[in-house]
Amino acid sequence: MNAFSGGARRTLVGAAVSCSLCGTALAQQATPHPFDQITVSADRITPTAPGEDAARAEAARVPGGTDVVSASDYAHGRASTFSDVFAFSPGVFAQPRFGAEEARLSIRGSGLQRTFHMRGIYLMQDGVPITLADGSGDFQTVEPLALSYTEVRRGANALEYGGTTLGGSINFVSPSGHDGGGIRPRVEGGSFGYRRALVTVGDASKNSDYFASLSAYEQDGFRDWSHQENERLFANAGFRLSETVESRFFVSALSSYSQLPGSITKAQLKADPEQANATSLAGRQKRNYDLYRLANRTVIELGNDSRLELTAGYSYKDLFHPIFQVLQQRSNDYNLGVRYVAEHSLGGFANRVVLGASPSWNDVSDDRFVNVAGQKGAPTAASEQRSSNLTAYAEDQLAVTSRWTLVAGVQWTDSKRRYDDHFLSNGDQSLDATYARIAPKLGFLWQVTRDWTVYGNVSDSFEPPSFGELTGGPGIDLLDAQHARTVELGTRGTVARVQWDFAAYSARVHDELLGLNGPGGEPLGTVNAPHTRHDGFEAGAQVAITKSLSWRSSYLWSRFRFDDNASYGDNALPGIPAHFYRGELTWAPARGTASVYFITLNTEWSPRRYAVDMAHTLFADPYTLFGLKVGRNAGAGFSWFLEGRNLANRTYTATTGVIADARGQDAAQFLPGDGRAVYAGVSWKPK
């Protein structure tokens, strides 16, 4: 029997669903391009692989910044980097490091010092963590073209999935066999030796379905010593075991090879942005690894509008990584999850409760050697690194009126980091640390109209250091966990032809983890900054100007700074521009009920210089880029696109490193963006 009364259930669910569907409708109207090879069936009902409409309805319940990025939003152009995926996702700063899959990914200033890999964001794939147990992550574990959509929960809005970090969570969701059967190939190619091929296959029957993708990617790169290649297999199969139980298994296998050209000085960037860092080139620096992953997600419908979600995952990674030393690592990562969701009446009010726990742990064998032209020399370190985390969380939403919903939540996290030093010639540097904290959350949702919501929350975040911080310098850094309290106020909705998502936030951060490099790029370790402030404004908008003409944009204002620091006063934290804008104008004339072709003009604008060092003596320059995309649905299931990027061939800094004090001198901290480039792609799907 349904525990909701009809009125109570409509109070809590109806507004969220109607608002999310309205947003979906405008998103489709405002991006009318025909290149939709990764079409998702919004009508499918499979608990272990919910559709995009269900994800939007869930996001509409959240009293904070969220987004759902459909794969069709970026499939009409080159789809290679996280910058391609999140180009128009409000609040997400994603910049390629050297035109390849490595990126600088940050939300609300998360992981500011990390110009490599990722920290400060809880990454999941199909609801199962792919972030490693110590909090670090890789970008090559995701194939953008093998996704149906991506969920973004900014900041503490990731609480109901176990995310505790300042940046929040990102969940990459794979298609299931219900998203369309048959074989679907796609190929892309273009400048700098870029080549990518993908084929997917899927099918569904009454009680089972499967989906698989196989991709291969290679590029020579804009810069010297920036060749990349990888091969990736992703597959999942779902089984309806009974009327109330569904289980889905996921398999991933990938091999990644990346040359690392490193950072160069500002003068070198202006003279020849294609050159590699001399030290990187001499050390033949690269990052190669193989990864294998197994996961399961099982959903049990308990009746009375309640369900139990169970997840489990295991991954193995073998890494060979010549940088300032040669790192050779073999890691085993494990995670489990249990999540209970119930919707019922509480004192006559509609109520939704989420309870969950997510333990994770890993074991890393880490051996280090002198780098002799990219090969192993004499050993310099040997260790065993063990991480474990246990996060328990609870969140309750109570609809106190037809327009107002109050939200309260809490998390408890216990994390352990153990470093066993097996190379004792330079002394025993073993480490055993425990980090624990409770993080509360209070928020509200105000349904101003059917299509307009105002929200706000006050919430805490908690982030223990990863081994990248603890062992990333010349020795072991004894660090405290980073924690913060964030106040957020925002609005999302649709009026006529306009859809918007605006959020302002202010975070007081304590013991922020800031990594330092020397002027030559050598790692100097990580420190805790006692007090910092992260203030920002995140904006996304779409406008259907006419039936054929649409505009969409995203804007980030970021004011991250020290708070009365003894050395740096109130200086802005380096590494991310204060203002960052992307926009595109698309013309897609309709023929009948579908668009046959499209033309898109786009721009990327960083209008002000920003600091590279904490002392503010070295800066990255502003820039403006322009691009053009055209595409056509050629009939018989075929579509194609042609895209030009950086058409003015602007020399610019895509992102930078972070150093303490450049003392007014130039330093090798600049990562050039790609020059003028042209890409093309073609795909086919069965009718």
Where are these regions (language model features)?
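C-terminal beta-signal and adjacent terminal beta-strands/loops
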Residues: 605-612, 632-687
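Short acidic/polar hinge/loop motifs at secondary-structure boundaries
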Residues: 112, 121, 128-154
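Transmembrane beta-barrel wall of Gram-negative outer-membrane proteins
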Residues: 182, 189-218, 223-261, 286-302, ...
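Membrane-embedded beta-barrel scaffold of Gram-negative outer-membrane proteins
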Residues: 307-320, 447, 453-459, 481-544, ...
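Extracytoplasmic beta-strand/coil segments of soluble accessory domains associated
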Residues: 63-66, 83-128
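N-terminal periplasmic "start-of-domain" segments of outer-membrane beta-barrel proteins
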Residues: 37-77, 103-106, 121
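Gram-negative outer-membrane beta-barrel transporters
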Residues: 401, 406, 414, 506-508, ...
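Signature of Gram-negative outer-membrane beta-barrel scaffolds
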Residues: 350, 357-447
